[in-house]
Amino acid sequence: MIITILPSSANFHAIAYNEMKVEKGVATLLEAQNILGLRQEAYTPEKLRQYFLDYSSRNTHIQNAQFHVAVSCKGNEYTHQQLLDIAHRYLKEMGYAEEGQPLLIYAHHDTPNNHIHIVTSRVAPDGHKIDHAHEKRRSREIT
């Protein structure tokens, strides 16, 4: 299994990327948590992006609030459900699982390898910045 932390962003570009994959039929939104005030049938790329921007504005000191991660395996070694379970454990160990933390998890079907993408904010529900010290090292240790 490979977990890759993808580039952060001030504008939550990962949402548009993943939603474009959904529109093309090569990805599925597996899970959306804590997207308050939006019914899932009302989700659009722009509404989701705006939600994450508004949520992240709780801490104006964080310039690139997007946290975007890909979790993949060789072929079909893990099902998307197993990758989803791995993603939840990963988020907890990395500090992104506080109650109220918004997140989107997408399953991608555009390569021979099962993989998912996670999009969340580096801002915790109480407004503090989620610790990112030694993030890549900690991420490697989890896998």
How would you describe each model-predicted region?
Residues 1-143:
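N-terminal nicking endonuclease/strand-transfer module with a His-rich metal-binding environment
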